[in-house]
């Protein structure tokens, strides 16, 4: 049975999630118990996918009035253009549409220019509005236009520069991943009396565009989708949960054997000697018939009546179509209802 390869492996419980004051950015997930070695296998795989493969939004280019290239400087701006571009790379964005999109910034001094001053379309959210882009002296002003796109992983500036780029357009290195940091460790954990299992502890930090819990879920879904192509066999059909079983014309408990009733030795021997095997055989007997059984007395009768009453049954019942021809097969099929 090929399904034993995966069915007999222990399955972890739903991950425990620990969050701090900012659940949208930082979380710790604990999954246990895992088979020995699966902590590293899953932890490393999830970490790599989290850092490289999740979709996000980032600035891919910027144009600054009065700037021809990134090695320029602006009068009245304390930072040079290289530093401004580095600050632009750290903008945390959430985009609800396909790119490219444009954002504009107009500011006058004195003071710090922050991301909250950027004019963005309705389908772009700026998640770190207090992030400083540059600092202006009194009387200085600046105007910038940003190009925002969606993507995954890291894309260098030269890949973001279009062939027909106008003079003054500065391509920006883009880190699209909303995940800023992923760390994991594996510790031994107990399952029953055995300590030979793994506990996976993952710490995930994002820029707020996606929660850490959702980020892990997306990474797991990516792995699931990629691994699916390696399953080259057809799995045995599973029984659908809740699938209706064929109806019995009697209570399934009647298929239970009388030696499972935990009767006294005397009562059990009397039933055995009278060839009473199933509860269905027993309940069709009347009290008078039972008392005519050799060595069967009133005490044994009361014991059996009490046990049957606990099952909602009694002696002297009429059971149509008893015994069924395939009684042993039916007993196995309806075992969970007995």
UniProtKB/Swiss-Prot annotation:
Gene Ontology CC: cytoplasm; DNA-directed RNA polymerase complex
Catalytic activity: RNA(n) + a ribonucleoside 5'-triphosphate = RNA(n+1) + diphosphate
EC number: 2.7.7.6
Region annotation Alpha N-terminal domain (alpha-NTD): where it falls in the sequence: 1-234
InterPro entries in alphabetical order: DNA-dir_RNA_pol_insert, DNA-dir_RNA_pol_RpoA/D/Rpb3, DNA-dir_RpoA, RBP11-like, RNAP_asu_C, RNApol_insert_sf
Pfam families: RNA_pol_A_bac, RNA_pol_A_CTD, RNA_pol_L
Location of the region described as Alpha C-terminal domain (alpha-CTD) in the Swiss-Prot/TrEMBL record: 250-338
Highest taxon, organism lineage: Bacteria
Record key words, sorted: DNA-directed RNA polymerase, Nucleotidyltransferase, Transcription, Transferase
Gene3D superfamilies cross-referenced by the UniProt entry: 5' to 3' exonuclease, C-terminal subdomain, DNA-directed RNA polymerase, insert domain, RNA polymerase, RBP11-like subunit
Top EC class for this record: transferase
Domain remarks: The N-terminal domain is essential for RNAP assembly and basal transcription, whereas the C-terminal domain is involved in interaction with transcriptional regulators and with upstream promoter elements.
Summary of the function given for this chain in its UniProt record: DNA-dependent RNA polymerase catalyzes the transcription of DNA into RNA using the four ribonucleoside triphosphates as substrates.
Quaternary structure, from the entry: Homodimer. The RNAP catalytic core consists of 2 alpha, 1 beta, 1 beta' and 1 omega subunit. When a sigma factor is associated with the core the holoenzyme is formed, which can initiate transcription.
Record-stated family: Belongs to the RNA polymerase alpha chain family.
Protein name: DNA-directed RNA polymerase subunit alpha
Species of the source: Phenylobacterium zucineum (strain HLK1)
């Amino acid at each position: 049975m090929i399904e034993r390869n995966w069915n007999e492996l222990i399955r972890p419980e739903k991950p425990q999630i620990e969050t701090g004051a900012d659940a949208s950015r930082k979380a710790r997930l604990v999954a246990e118990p895992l088979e020995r070695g699966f902590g590293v296998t899953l932890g490393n795989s999830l970490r790599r996918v989290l850092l490289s493969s999740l979709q996000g939004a980032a600035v891919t280019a910027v144009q600054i009035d009065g700037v021809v290239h990134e090695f320029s400087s602006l009068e009245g701006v304390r930072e040079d253009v290289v530093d401004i571009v580095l600050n632009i790379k750290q903008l945390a964005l959430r985009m609800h549409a396909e790119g490219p999109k444009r954002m504009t910034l107009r500011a006058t001094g004195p003071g710090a220019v922050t991301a909250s001053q950027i004019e963005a379309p309705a389908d772009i959210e700026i998640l770190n509005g207090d992030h400083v882009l540059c600092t202006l002296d009194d009387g200085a002003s600046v105007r910038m236009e940003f190009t925002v796109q969606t993507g995954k992983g890291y894309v260098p500036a030269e890949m973001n520069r279009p062939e027909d780029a106008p003079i003054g357009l500065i391509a920006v290195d883009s880190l699209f991943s909303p995940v800023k940091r992923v760390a994991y460790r594996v510790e031994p954990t107990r399952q029953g009396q055995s300590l030979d299992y793994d506990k996976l502890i993952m710490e995930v930090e994002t820029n707020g565009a996606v929660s850490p819990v959702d980020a892990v879920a997306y990474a797991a879904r990516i792995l699931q989708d990629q691994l699916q192509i390696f399953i080259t066999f057809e799995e045995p059909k599973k029984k659908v949960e809740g699938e209706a079983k064929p109806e019995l014309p009697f209570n399934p408990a009647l298929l239970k054997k009388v030696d499972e009733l935990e009767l006294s030795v005397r009562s059990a021997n009397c039933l055995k000697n009278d060839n009473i095997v199933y509860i269905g055989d027993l309940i069709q007997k009347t009290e008078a018939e039972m008392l005519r059984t050799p060595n069967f007395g009133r005490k044994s009768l009361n014991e059996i009546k009490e046990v049957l009453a606990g099952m909602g049954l009694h002696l002297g019942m009429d059971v149509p179509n008893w015994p069924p021809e395939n009684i042993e097969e039916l007993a196995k099929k309806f075992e969970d209802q007995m």
